[in-house]
Amino acid sequence: MAANVGSMFQYWKRFDLQQLQRELDATATVLANRQDESEQSRKRLIEQSREFKKNTPEDLRKQVAPLLKSFQGEIDALSKRSKEAEAAFLNVYKRLIDVPDPVPALDLGQQLQLKVQRLHDIETENQKLRETLEEYNKEFAEVKNQEVTIKALKEKIREYEQTLKNQAETIALEKEQKLQNDFAEKERKLQETQMSTTSKLEEAEHKVQSLQTALEKTRTELFDLKTKYDEETTAKADEIEMIMTDLERANQRAEVAQREAETLREQLSSANHSLQLASQIQKAPDVEQAIEVLTRSSLEVELAAKEREIAQLVEDVQRLQASLTKLRENSASQISQLEQQLSAKNSTLKQLEEKLKGQADYEEVKKELNILKSMEFAPSEGAGTQDAAKPLEVLLLEKNRSLQSENAALRISNSDLSGRCAELQVRVTEAVATATEQRELIARLEQDLSIIQSIQRPDAEGAAEHRLEKIPEPIKEATALFYGPTAPASGALPEGQVDSLLSIISSQRERFRARNQELEAENRLAQHTLQALQSELDSLRADNIKLFEKIKFLQSYPGRGSGSDDTELRYSSQYEERLDPFSSFSKRERQRKYLSMSPWDKATLSMGRLVLSNKMARTIGFFYTLFLHCLVFLVLYKLAWSESMERDCATFCAKKFADHLHKFHENDNGAAAGDLWQ
């Protein structure tokens, strides 16, 4: 199994999946560029072929047509084959680009197998050591009085413990070195990911800018066409309105002329009627005939003039109608042309809008990028004007470098503080042990001091000698300095010597108390430092989550997904937990339940949280509960014992009373007393 894992690890390491993914990514970009170039060259070739057909005579076109068709068929076959190859490459690229690299997992598995094998070796060695220790214990049980053997065994045990400790330290150092190497590799991968993200972001911004310029140009052209169309329509409308007014005037004049012609016709008919009457009246004088002839001639002249005027007006009306129809045709043709141009521009605008649908959030992204520039990448107001001229990639790189330097400084300070914290914890444990020893020593000294004070007040003769036997040897040695070499064995201590001994013990006690207070102050300082480090670690974790959120925002642009490591997965899970609607909903529900609780329930819950969140409070609560249980059990035991004693006492008294009655009043009223007792 280990050989298979090792061979797989070597194979995947030689295979270098990440390098293959980068090469495939580069090849995909080159293919995309070549597709664009092929499309442009194809368009140019089509235009050149059209120009060739236009500028080439018919017989030459007929001769070249088969060659062109075969050449075009070969080009179509080559383009089809290249498209199929590109499609197959893109299919392989899509499947391989998101495949995670199994080298770290295989490396970790191999290391775990090595660790398991090493653990088995250590276990076997430990078993051997245990067997050896059991043998030594048997030998030690057999030869208890051999001090040399005991010392040798102790030395061997110390050596074994030292070897185990050294092995544990070497394993810890190897693990720390491995973690440092993994962290450096992850930082390098993160930098590469950020560089690729910035390049893709730059390409996307360039495309968006080009599309934006094309859209603005199209909008300006469309606006110019609309303004021209509006101006021409207004001019044509004004011209048509003028022509219509002229036409109405001509129609009015024609109607007036027709009415005048009708009146003249009526007058002519009346004149003809009068002429007929005059012809009938032939006997009339010559003067009247002359007058009638004159009136008839004048009416005829006037009628001819009116008819000429009517004909001229009819010609004017026809001419105006012809010009109106011509103007309508011209305006209709111009309107159709403008409508065609407008439809073409609208189709172009729709195409551009469809192209911009993928970048519909350009303004929002631009606004967010400006906000990011202003908030995250501008350290001061003076540097804001200088950073405004820098591109986003430079700002991201500078921010990444500053964050890396801050992270390194914080890591160094964290390691220093953790070392100091470990030293302080060791010191605190030593101080606590020393304090406990000092407390025990103080208690013994106080007990000995009370014994010495009781010696000064003997109850009777010989009591001092009896109590001097209870004094420990160190106190006897300490008091021997005050007695002198010929101190009486049966007398009381002098008052000055006891006072000096009390002053020594009290000063030593004060020194121990001051030292204990110093150690407690150092312990509080160490606890405060630990809390500050914990808060700083929480803030760093929050900053890392925010940085991961920004990286995820930058990775939201179209592109291949980069391989994720353990750190990214951990911060990704924390980021998803922050964005999880179920967790936020559960928090809101817990808050709502907490607000709907009664005040005493809130007090009980707060007290429980306070007790469970603090180690000292948990310890106090545990011992307090234990004390209450013991007290209740003691009270119950006392009550049961008192009741049993009362019962036993009552039984004993009744028995004694019955014995007394049987013994002393046996003859008189023994039966009555028995009935009374029953």
Curated annotation (Swiss-Prot):
GO molecular function annotation: DNA-binding transcription factor activity, RNA polymerase II-specific; RNA polymerase II transcription regulatory region sequence-specific DNA binding
Bilayer topology: Single-pass type IV membrane protein
Keywords: Coiled coil, Disulfide bond, Golgi apparatus, Membrane, Phosphoprotein, Transmembrane, Transmembrane helix, Transport
Cellular localisation: Golgi apparatus membrane
GO cellular component: Golgi membrane; nucleus
Short name of any one Pfam family annotated for the protein: CASP_C
Principal subcellular localization: Golgi
GO terms (BP aspect): intra-Golgi vesicle-mediated transport
Modified residues (Phosphoserine): 586
Keyword match Amino-acid biosynthesis: no
Transmembrane annotation, as ranges: 620-640
Superkingdom of the source species: Eukaryota
Lumenal side: 641-678
Residues in compartment: Cytoplasmic: 1-619
Coiled coil: 67-450, 502-556
Oligomer and partners: Homodimer; disulfide-linked. Interacts with GOLGA5.
Known role: May be involved in intra-Golgi retrograde transport.
Membership in a protein family: Belongs to the CASP family.
Protein name, as recorded: Protein CASP
Organism: Pongo abelii (Sumatran orangutan)
